[in-house]
Amino acid sequence: MVQSYASAMFRVLKADDYSPAAQQQNILALGKGSSLFPTDNHSSNDGRETRGSGRESGQDRVKRPMNAFIVWSRDQRRKVALENPQMQNSEISKWLGCKWKMLTEAEKRPFFEEAQRLQAVHRDKYPGYKYRPRRKGERAQNLLPAEAAVLCSQVRVEERMYPFTYTVAKAKCSGTESQLSHSQPMNITSSLLQQEDRCNWTGLCHSRVTSTGQIRADLPFHRGLQPGLSHIYFPY
């Protein structure tokens, strides 16, 4: 199939008319008859099948019967919207909720009776109805590192022992990009240092540092630092 398509394409390019418009029309005509080019009809059919395979469509979904507050607020919402066109729907809902709470039981009773009547009609019309609330889409949670840091058991040190002064800066991570904002430096002085093997700044370090407190962090060390100073950025 690929060879036949290549030979057909070669014949198109060898045609007498070398104008770009003619060549483009020939290629498009060849692509329509070839199975190598997907058509829009297949994708549109897939879209219809996907939409049709949903749990419930908007027209088939049965609405819940109205409660007393909804029965009361229908006319009230319409009146408030006409009298105050500048008010938003959320503000109108808050105002209606406060006003509904201020009504007495005697004032609410007719609306409760109407709501019970509507529920009875709904049960007769849909005997097997079960309320199925729509699930809200789960919000994508920001991926955080498994831990803010890992146990710092090996660090790069020079051949001689130096007390380490770590400058810590917070890093705010957003997606795949991170912006570093420096906070107040925090000095952590190691009290006990034990060197097991020799190491240099370019090779793998085999030195183990034991301190009074455990330092947990990913340590992006920089080679151009002075022997006794290392900068650590903690993902925050």
Swiss-Prot record:
PROSITE patterns: HMG_BOX_2. One of its GO terms (biological process) is cell differentiation. It is found in: Nucleus speckle; Cytoplasm; Nucleus. It holds the Pfam family HMG_box. GO terms for molecular function: calmodulin binding; DNA-binding transcription activator activity, RNA polymerase II-specific; RNA polymerase II cis-regulatory region sequence-specific DNA binding. Residues 43-61 have a biased composition (Basic and acidic residues). InterPro entries: HMG_box_dom, HMG_box_dom_sf, SRY, SRY-related_HMG-box_TF-like. Interacts with CALM, EP300, HDAC3, KPNB1, ZNF208 isoform KRAB-O, PARP1, SLC9A3R2 and WT1. The interaction with EP300 modulates its DNA-binding activity. The interaction with KPNB1 is sensitive to dissociation by Ran in the GTP-bound form. Interaction with PARP1 impaired its DNA-binding activity. Transcriptional regulator that controls a genetic switch in male development. It is necessary and sufficient for initiating male sex determination by directing the development of supporting cell precursors (pre-Sertoli cells) as Sertoli rather than granulosa cells. Involved in different aspects of gene regulation including promoter activation or repression. Binds to the DNA consensus sequence 5'-[AT]AACAA[AT]-3'. SRY HMG box recognizes DNA by partial intercalation in the minor groove and promotes DNA bending. Also involved in pre-mRNA splicing. Belongs to the SRY family. This is Sex-determining region Y protein. It comes from Sus scrofa.
